[in-house]
Design a protein with these regions (language model features):
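Loop-to-transmembrane helix entry/capping segments in MFS-fold secondary transporters
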Residues: 43-44, 137-146, 351, 435-447
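Intracellular juxtamembrane helix-capping segments at the cytosolic ends
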Residues: 122-135, 422-436
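C-terminal transmembrane helical hairpin of 12-TM major facilitator-type secondary transporters
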Residues: 384-426
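Helix-loop boundary and gating motifs at the non-cytosolic
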Residues: 2-56, 309-313, 317-341
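Helix-to-loop junctions at the C-terminal end of transmembrane segments
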Residues: 59-75, 368-382, 466
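C-terminal ends and interior cores of transmembrane alpha-helices
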Residues: 82-103, 391-404
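Intracellular loop-helix junctions on the cytosolic face of multi-pass helical membrane proteins
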Residues: 1-7, 100, 104-108, 123, ...
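Hydrophobic core of transmembrane alpha-helices in multi-pass small-molecule transporters
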Residues: 92-123, 408-422
Length: 504
């Protein structure tokens, strides 16, 4: 038995919630550096303040993936998590603009970023698996393309909203230490947008029950919990010990090499995973029943080959994206608009231009997902399509390094937008057709590790590199971003060899 084929409105309803989620992400990505700098953070403080975002994704997504694979109640399998995350994100978006009125505004803003990113991840992670749950294999590419179009459209609205408010007469400049009304109102609008969009998907879709999913044909078989326990029991703890040693080496390198203290977080995460790996092995050898830890550790160590090779691509792809989100505002305001004074009209004009630039790349992504990517995929296949798009994005980052004209940067954003569309669609379409249906949640959550880890590296190591070699010159980060996407494009050549000749 095959799943029913979804028409236009079916595809629309399945992914519309992502529109609201991406409004929230866009407001976060385009405005949080501005918020932090306005509240007194220096350029060197930004990576540490941003570290909350990837860290929450690293923790939240595998857990939510595991839980959603095993959830079934009146709301369904994935929808309970959509709704919970949307409510929490709306609260964080509402409270964020109140930071200047709090006794410790910078700490409060960082805490709200943590809550916001965790909440958006709670909503976002099940949406990735939701497309695979609801669609037959031959509609996976179309489903993720529609999802990407909504991501682009939501990001366009979230990115452009402060700029639109300014042109409607809302104040874009505020006293020192206060947020402009354009930013405040944009965050409150985002709170409403995410609730409305997610509620739409929750109430216009019906998830297939576990029994219905089991009856559908054409899905890759999943390892059962017993096989995972047996695989863990057969493992040696040397791998966990190696992770712990790596964490200790990273921690020692902080003092030896004079790295920023945020790098300690990376060392701690490596050591913690090593400990969890050893604990999971011991529990398996004792005959402990399958649990969340054994599932996450076991599935991580037993990833299918195609997922392992795509993980390398994701690592370099998201390194560049996080560099862009942190540094575009400082680069544009300093090099194009000539100001680092957050209370100046020039700085705020440049910060709003960043919203326009982010609107362009997200708008391009929305169009490319529906028009360009399907054409390229039919002509060259999904693997070569992704490689081509990443190359175009790398050229866009090079433009930021060399160009000093605000309008010329729009051309750069076209290449970045095409690459962004492909990053959001192609890897997930490939995975959804080659992973066990019953484990889409946990595998999509684990795949997020290779989105989060590079962001943590950027948030910790990049600050040390810039401080040591390019102090006060954030434009060099764009060269790092270009190199990262060039490496990702080359890494895609290894992916095709891991895709089975016959997919389910």
């Amino acid at each position: 038995m095959e799943k029913p084929r979804q028409g236009f409105w079916g595809l629309w309803n399945i992914s519309f919630g992502f529109f609201g989620i991406q409004v929230g992400f866009a407001l976060q990505n385009a405005n949080m550096s501005r918020v932090f700098q306005t509240l007194g953070a220096s350029m060197d403080d930004l990576p540490a303040l941003w570290v909350a975002a990837p860290l929450t994704g690293l923790i939240v997504q595998p857990i939510i993936g595991h839980l959603s694979d095993r959830t079934w109640n009146r709301l369904g399998r994935r929808r309970p998590y959509f709704l919970t995350g949307a409510i929490m994100a709306a609260i964080a978006l509402f409270l964020m603009p109140l930071a200047p009125t709090i006794a410790a505004p910078l700490v409060f803003a960082a805490a709200m970023l943590w809550v916001l990113d965790a909440s958006l991840n709670i909503s976002m992670e099940p949406f990735r698996a939701f497309v695979g749950d609801m669609l037959r294999t031959d509609q996976h590419a179309a489903g993720y393309a529609v999802q990407t179009a909504f991501i682009g459209a939501g990001a366009v609205l979230g990115s452009i909203f402060p700029w639109l408010l300014e042109h409607l007469g809302v104040d874009n400049v505020a006293p020192e230490g206060a947020l402009p009304n354009t930013v405040r109102y944009a965050f409150w609008f985002g709170a409403v947008a995410i609730l409305v969009a997610v509620v739409w998907t929750v109430f216009t879709t019906r998830e297939y029950s576990p029994e219905e999913q089991a009856a559908f044909s054409g899905h890759v078989a999943a390892d059962d919990d017993g096989e995972i326990i047996a695989r863990l029991a057969a493992k040696k703890p040397l791998g966990g010990i190696a992770w712990i040693v790596a964490g200790v080496i990273v921690a020692l390198a902080v003092d030896l090499l004079g790295l920023q203290k945020e790098v300690l977080l990376l060392g701690a995460l490596l050591a913690i995973y090593g400990v969890l790996d050893i604990v999971a092995i011991r529990m398996a050898r004792r005959g402990t029943k399958p649990n969340m830890l054994s599932s996450i550790v076991g599935d991580f160590s037993g990833m299918p080959p195609v997922m392992k090779r795509l993980a390398l691509v994701q690592f370099f792809s998201w390194s560049a994206l996080f560099i862009m989100w942190i540094n575009t505002t400082p680069v544009v305001t300093q090099y194009v608009f000539g100001s680092t004074d957050t209370a100046s009209a020039a700085y705020n004009e440049g910060a709003n231009w960043v919203n326009v630039l982010f609107t362009v790349y997200n708008g391009v992504a929305a169009v490319a997902a529906l028009v360009l990517l399907p054409w390229l995929s039919r002509r060259f296949g999904p693997v070569r399509t992704h490689s081509i798009c990443l190359t175009l994005g790398a050229l866009g980052f090079l433009g930021f390094f060399f160009l000093r004209d605000a309008n010329a940067l729009i051309v750069c954003e076209i290449g970045i937008g095409i690459a962004w569309a492909s990053i959001l669609a192609m890897p997930y379409a490939i995975l959804a057709s080659n992973l066990p249906q019953a484990k889409l949640g946990i595998y999509m959550g684990l795949f997020n590790i290779f989105i989060v880890v590079p962001q943590l590296l950027v948030a910790t190591v990049m600050g040390s590199i810039m401080l040591a070699f390019f102090p006060g010159e954030p434009v060099w980060t764009m060269l790092f971003a270009a190199a990262a996407w060039a490496v990702a494009a080359l890494a895609m050549t290894r992916v095709s060899a891991a895709i089975p000749a016959r997919t389910a």
